[in-house]
Amino acid sequence: MTRIARDDTRLYNSLMLPPFSVVIPCFNEAARIGATIRATLDYLHKNSPESELIVVNDGSTDATGAIARGIFADAKITTRLLENFPNRGKGAAVRSGLLAAKKPIALFSDADLSTPLEETPKVIEPIANGEVDIAFGSRGLNRRLIGQHQPWRREQAGRIFNLLVRLATDLPFWDTQCGFKAFRMDACRPILEAARIDGFAFDVELLFLAQRAGLRIREIPVRWNHSEGSKVHVIYDSLAMLREVIALRMAS
């Protein structure tokens, strides 16, 4: 496992990215999914036109699915809408999207685009170049790249959670929860098929299984901005995530 402790955008200045799949899980995101899809399609059209966009509607009770279908009807990029009903959880949504990916590399990104799309080459190119099997964005390696911080309580809870994850799993990473992770699918498909956590701790499970399988993992600092409307409850979901991590450790 390796970590890049600096932000050097000059390293990622290729004119065009190789084809990859983008997976966006969403639950009741009608207020912003339209803008997110349009921005993603525009980015792919300009930087990787052979790529595909997969939106996973995880049992939304609002117009999320209808909005996605409407935009996809005129898309120039290959698109797919997967529907999970009832809601199964973010982990299940991400897994179903990644396992449906048809490109050699797949990236999942949160629906709020807290990590700007312009950071995409940082996680795609190390995989395309054969350096790693998993590359993921991190807020923990260079906090100066955080533009808009989370509320203080939420940010501290996240830092404590990541410390407990390090202690419980021996994972050497400083931010397992940033929603910006890319996978070399031929290497990662077995761990995705083996994963069982459907909740918010799914990231930890994927990294844990990948490390145990000997895959090459790289944590990379990315720009990040907090967006309002998070579905994560600071207390209840943090406790649920800790229970999932403890169960993961005991099962291993």
Task: List where the protein language model places each region.
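Acidic donor-diphosphate engagement hotspot in glycosyltransferases and nucleotidyltransferases
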Residues: T36, T64, V94, E118-T120, ...
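Hydrophobic helical membrane-anchoring modules
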Residues: T9-P19, L163, D170, A194-S252
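A conserved acidic beta->alpha catalytic loop
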Residues: N57-A66, L113
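Short, well-formed alpha-helical segments that are part of the catalytic scaffolds
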Residues: E29-L44
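Acceptor/aglycone-binding surface of glycosyltransferases and processive sugar-polymer synthases
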Residues: N84-A100, I105, L117-F200, H226-Y236, ...
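Donor nucleotide-sugar binding loop of glycosyltransferases
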Residues: E29-R32, S60, K90, P116
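Conserved donor nucleotide-binding strand/loop of the catalytic core
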Residues: E50-I54, G65-A100
